[in-house]
């Protein structure tokens, strides 16, 4: 008797399992709101047209719409609503439960217009100086790929940082002087280019030395000139010491007579 009841119960459950197959989850897009409509579809046995079924919706294995007679769920088009969706159908008494397969839905946000800045320490850029290009897109689904351009030529390789900004460190070249530079941000659904900017004037090595040495040598040369001028002035305009004017010597009368007298005696 007990065995017969078990067999009867198993047969009833097997028949119940055949009342409907596993459901199928499909998606549609609302043309006005761009929201995604999920529909849980199931084929009911024509022999049981009055069978009452209930639907449950899941996202990443978490219930997002609890058990209800509604077979439709609407997901707003937001990036945070991306994930794996699934639905389950069960009978009114809950004895039969069947789940659909997973449906991977991804909501992508277009990348925003990137902002480009140039950072450098030198006041006057010279060949070989280091500069940093910084490009940032404030919105857009990750990953975002960044590329930098100057005069229409790409600098390095595209960058894909984990965040929303990318930077490129580069050495200044002479041909960059006053050329246009820009950056590009791109994700899986869109791409945007920043505004064009003018690269600063790049001075040559000789001009850089002259412009940088002038503030150093100019004060030194002025100081040296002042010292030389002071020495010259001191040399030519120093006060002279007054000396007593020497008296003109006069011949003594006796000596002069003696000399004449001697001569006269010699030639007599």
Swiss-Prot record:
> Which organism does this sequence originate in?
Mus musculus (Mouse)
As for what it does, the entry says: Acts as a MHC class II receptor. When stimulated on its own, does not play a role in cytokine production or the release of cytotoxic granules by NK cells and cytotoxic CD8(+) T cells. Does not act as an Fc receptor.
Looking up Pfam families in the UniProt record yields: Ig_2, Ig_C17orf99
Q: What are the coiled-coil residue ranges?
A: none
Write the protein's name: Fc receptor-like protein 6
Q: Which residues lie on this side of the membrane: Extracellular?
A: 17-215
Q: Which domain of life is it from?
A: Eukaryota
Localization per Swiss-Prot or TrEMBL: Cell membrane
- The gene it comes from is Fcrl6
């Amino acid at each position: 008797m007990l065995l017969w009841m078990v067999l009867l119960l198993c047969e009833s459950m097997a028949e119940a399992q055949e009342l409907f197959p596993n459901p199928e989850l499909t998606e549609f897009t609302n043309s006005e709101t761009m929201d995604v409509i999920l529909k849980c579809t199931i084929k009911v046995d024509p022999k049981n047209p009055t069978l009452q079924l209930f639907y449950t919706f899941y996202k990443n294995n978490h219930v997002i719409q609890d058990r209800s007679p509604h077979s439709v769920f609407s997901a707003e088009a937001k990036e945070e609503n991306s994930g794996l969706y699934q639905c389950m159908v069960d009978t009114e008494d809950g004895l039969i439960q069947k789940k659909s397969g997973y449906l991977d839905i991804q909501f992508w946000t277009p990348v925003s217009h990137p902002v480009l800045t140039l950072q450098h320490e030198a006041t006057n850029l010279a060949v070989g100086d280091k500069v940093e290009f910084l490009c940032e897109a404030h919105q857009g689904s990750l990953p975002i790929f960044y590329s930098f351009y100057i005069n229409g030529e790409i600098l390095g390789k595209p960058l894909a940082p984990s965040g929303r900004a990318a930077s490129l460190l580069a050495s200044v070249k002479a041909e960059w002087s006053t050329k246009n530079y820009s950056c590009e941000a791109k994700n899986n659904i869109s791409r945007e280019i920043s505004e064009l900017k003018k690269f600063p004037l790049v001075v040559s090595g000789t001009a850089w030395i002259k412009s940088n040495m002038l503030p150093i040598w100019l004060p030194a040369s002025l100081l040296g000139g002042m010292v030389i001028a002071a020495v010259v002035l001191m040399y030519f305009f120093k006060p002279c010491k007054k000396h007593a004017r020497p008296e003109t010597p006069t011949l003594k009368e006796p000596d002069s007579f003696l000399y004449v007298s001697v001569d006269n005696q010699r030639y007599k």
